């Protein structure tokens, strides 16, 4: 088992939830956390603990974004008009690697980050290899022609269990996607409940 898979399993067990909706998640078999003390009964969690847990879950879902980068998303979310929690989700879903994942070009958020890093994606006809690049509504994302027959792409295109959300239009024949709008929390197909307002509260302490 790779270190990346081990890290995913550990986070799933710590949260007690199948964060990415994976069939092989350990929480599908048991409902306690990792380690020798994982089976102990847990008491009521403090407000701080609840907020921290919400932050760890949301940050981990997007490929474990660094704390420094996640704080920048928080700062931008509270600067923008409107609900800060909704703004945070919008910023995360505008990440290029998130759009690549949502478009079913690859199977996981982790694979999407690597796919972008390796230069397989164009935005509006220009190669972009920065996973955190902020996609705007109307932008066209394209898998480079030379990359379309890679096994990682072919396998992902056959995943019937994951639908493309309504805010992205995908042409799987041309391997292109267009973001039609920035989504709100209820539009994003998370396998588990995300609580961005608790994340905002965590950083606002």
From Swiss-Prot:
BP GO annotations: ribosomal small subunit biogenesis; translation
GO molecular function (one): structural constituent of ribosome
Region Disordered: start-end pairs: 1-49
UniProtKB keywords: Ribonucleoprotein, Ribosomal protein, RNA-binding, rRNA-binding
PROSITE patterns xrefs: RIBOSOMAL_S4, S4
Compositionally biased tracts (Basic residues): 1-12
Protein name, UniProt field: Small ribosomal subunit protein uS4
Organism, scientific name: Methylorubrum extorquens (strain PA1)
Gene name, Swiss-Prot/TrEMBL: rpsD
């Amino acid at each position: 088992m790779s270190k990346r898979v081990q890290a995913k399993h550990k986070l799933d067990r710590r949260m007690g939830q199948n964060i990415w909706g994976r069939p092989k998640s350990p929480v599908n078999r048991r409902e306690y956390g990792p380690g020798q003390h994982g089976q102990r009964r847990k008491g009521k969690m403090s407000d701080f603990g609840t907020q921290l847990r919400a932050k760890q879950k949301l940050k981990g879902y997007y490929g474990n974004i660094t704390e420094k980068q996640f704080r920048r998303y928080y700062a931008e979310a509270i600067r923008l008009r409107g609900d800060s929690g909704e703004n945070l989700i919008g910023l995360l879903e505008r990440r290029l690697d998130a759009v690549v994942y949502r478009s079913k070009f690859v199977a996981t958020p982790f694979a999407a980050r690597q796919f972008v890093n390796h230069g397989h994606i164009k935005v509006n006809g220009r190669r972009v290899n920065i996973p955190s690049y902020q996609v705007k509504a109307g932008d066209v994302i394209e898998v480079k022609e030379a990359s379309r027959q890679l096994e990682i792409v072919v396998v992902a295109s056959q995943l019937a269990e994951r639908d493309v959300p309504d805010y992205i239009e995908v042409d799987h024949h041309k391997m292109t996607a267009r973001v039609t709008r920035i989504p709100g929390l209820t539009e994003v197909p998370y396998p588990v409940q995300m609580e961005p307002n608790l994340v905002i509260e965590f950083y606002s302490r």
